[in-house]
Amino acid sequence: ALSNKQIMFNLTEAQLFRPVAKHVTLNSFLPVLFQKSAVLKRNEAVMVRIGVVGYGYWGPKVVRNINDTDGARVTAVSDLNSDARKRAQRAYPFIGTCSDYRDIVRSPDIDAVAVITPVATHFEIAKSALENGKHVFVEKPFTCTVSQAEELIESAEKRQLKIMVDHTFLFTGAVRKIKEIITQNGTLGELYYFDSTRVNLGQFQHDVNVVWDLAPHDLSIMDYLLMKNPDALIATGQAHFNHDLEDVAYI
């Protein structure tokens, strides 16, 4: 069975980020940094300069989307893998690269940092970025523990910085349409049951189980649609390929 600590983290993650969840996408993230209602244009004087830490599987997609977003430009990429850095340079010759993420978080020429690395490294990198005055965009899952998540939120609030998690499904047309139907003056009626299944998606992770890897998607959708906290839960799981990490789970 999955531990209570593991399951409660995922539920708490959705609850913690309710106040900022609407700002998760890049198009929403950028105006928030400068307290503007309209998306910044590339020809405006202000351009959000973003450093991306991690250029493995998901990092290239984040870099592409940032560079396709008005008002933003990736100016630096950090990755421990030299081949990954070379790929970034070939794709974007104007981007600087480095092996040490500290070079990015300490740079005065970077406004915000996107953390696209294994979850075990999220806390250290995000904390360092905040301490160096950078806004932070973190790939899900946010951190490894509730205490780490709360510490990062407190650090951001103390410094009046933005920190948010990449709950991408909250901005898909289907999820937003469901939200619209649910909230349309009771047109649908009272919602009694919510069921979500996520199967056969991607590789097995070496550092987190399937709940930590995939459940944040479903839990963030549930939190967005229902806006209610759970009263109780039951969870079970099994590990078939790695005896320490469950690859099948039911909550």
Predicted regions and their residues:
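Rossmann-like dinucleotide-binding domain that binds NAD(P)(H)
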Residues: 201-251
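Extreme N-terminal basic, low-complexity initiation segments
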Residues: 2-14
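A contiguous active-site-proximal alpha/beta segment in oxidoreductase catalytic domains
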Residues: 19, 143-205
